[in-house]
Design a protein with these regions (language model features):
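Short, glycine-/Ser/Thr-/acidic-enriched flexible segments
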Residues: 26, 84-87, 104-106, 126-129, ...
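Single conserved hydrophobic/aromatic residue that forms the stacking wall/gate
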Residues: 1-7, 11-12
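Short His/Asp/Glu-rich catalytic/ion-coordination signatures at enzyme active sites or charged loops
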Residues: 21, 119-130
């Protein structure tokens, strides 16, 4: 394992990717990532979910077409996927409880952690569920991932400067819930301009 590389500029790292992967920091992050993925799989499988994959080449957008990656496809247009949602909704009547861990591609500049050209994410679909059921699953998944990391990767987390007490709070705390109406009223009380029915973007969250 390499402890470091001379120069950390992006171009140097990209030109020496095979060496960068051997650095202590990168190796640590890959181990943590592996534990996160394993926790997601175990969470859903323990609850009788079926893992379901969808194509990465799709015919259209799911969440808006402004950031789609267009790909030439044998004389036709195709796009890199942003979500497995449409395929999952088609399969849900047959499988009822399904999930995936998959890549998502967006043709946008990677300016912040919220703007990534490619990222991996987990999605789930479940039949015969309401909003509270979905939130229950989401909260339980976060707790399960946090507990898994505390059990499997405490040293790695600390080596990256992560506070284990913060992660313990994610593992053990209750998550407050508020209705959309209340969220709008709270924002208005703080002087935020918002009308009922508008989405809550990152700044409002």
């Amino acid at each position: 394992m390499l402890l470091g590389l001379v120069g950390s500029e992006m171009c140097i790292r990209d030109s020496n990717r095979h060496l960068y992967l051997r650095t202590g920091r990168m190796t640590t992050m890959l181990k943590i990532r592996s534990s996160v993925f394993g926790a997601i799989h175990s969470f859903f499988r323990d609850r009788d979910f079926i893992e379901y994959q969808a194509p990465n080449f799709v015919a259209g957008a799911v969440e808006g077409g402004s950031t789609l990656f267009e790909v030439p496809y044998f004389g036709r247009k195709a796009y890199l996927t942003q979500s497995w949602q449409l395929y999952a909704e088609a399969a849900m009547p047959a499988l009822e409880r399904l999930y995936t861990i998959a890549p998502s591609f967006r043709a946008e500049k990677s300016r912040t952690r919220r703007h990534l050209t490619e990222f991996w994410h987990a999605e789930m679909e479940i039949a015969w569920a309401d909003n509270n059921d979905v939130m229950d699953y989401g909260e339980a998944l976060v707790r399960h991932i946090a507990r898994t990391l505390l059990n499997e990767r405490p040293a790695e987390l600390e080596s990256l400067g992560r506070d284990l007490e913060v992660i313990r709070r994610f593992a053990d705390s209750d998550y407050p819930r508020i209705r959309y109406d209340e969220a709008v009223e709270r924002l208005k009380s703080k002087g935020v301009e918002i009308e009922w029915g508008q989405d809550l973007d990152y700044s409002k969250e």
